[in-house]
């Protein structure tokens, strides 16, 4: 994640760096990304990049968190703890719609297609109930499939809704 130096930059400069990251990581995989293109686009010194981020992976993860925070906010993310199949289904639909309509579409699509496997797996709490874990895994798989193969969206959505309903029956 970014350093405190980055956090204390004027908002306009943070936005410029973030926009340069989005341009780079939307056009190039993490493996092919270059600091040189980022610093040229952001109009910052190469040394400044390394004051803001440890490396390209750190910068990528920062941008990924920014994108998810914005997309989840616009998709109306819900943090309820009770299992509700329809709410989870609608959250996936809203998330996909927000990604499709956002500046992050190419970045998120490339994340699933090329970059996800290059990053460390996010830890999942061992206290997460099995049904919540199943819904989470299923939802993320559905999002990935829809974004990578948009023509399959209707089929994936129906399969997701059906499976979540089965999980709901198990929960009730």
Predicted feature residues:
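Alpha-helical structural segments
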Residues: 12, 19-23, 27, 41, ...
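Short hydrophobic/aromatic patch on the recognition helix
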Residues: 43-53
